[in-house]
Amino acid sequence: FNLWPVAVKMVLLLVMIVGGCAGSTAGGIKVVRTALLFKLGRREIRHTFQPRKVQVVRFEGKGVEEGMLSQVAMFFCVYVLMLLLGAFAISLEGRFDVETNLTAALTCLSNVGPGLGAVGPVENFSGYGPFAKLVLSLLMLAGRLELFPILALFHPAIWRKS
């Protein structure tokens, strides 16, 4: 694993971020959301060159509603934010390098196999302290249960009596 070229490790990280298919128990952003993100990005680039043209994002031959596209974009932003905040939080312990901390957060948030560095396939998370393990556990829950239901728990409207 550690002898692999950097390009192969980058491909592995990208696959870890994408995760599995929609409806599966796999974590990650999911294949459908990733495809929609690329289509949305392509539309926005085209929009800069033809700002007056109405361009509909199509998926499997059907137009995708703007609300769905904004939800996908928001999910991606929240995913990246949680990944970076999680990696930063566990790096506060100062025990491991950036590669290890970032891939540890990614493996937990995406619920995939081993990371890189000190959390690689022949290593484990035992080198982290209690605070980092708590953060990583929360990332695992957020990744497994999807991000928005977890974030909804912290919304005040959920806890108000109706």
Predicted regions and their residues:
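Membrane-proximal intracellular helices of multi-pass ion channels
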Residues: F1-S162
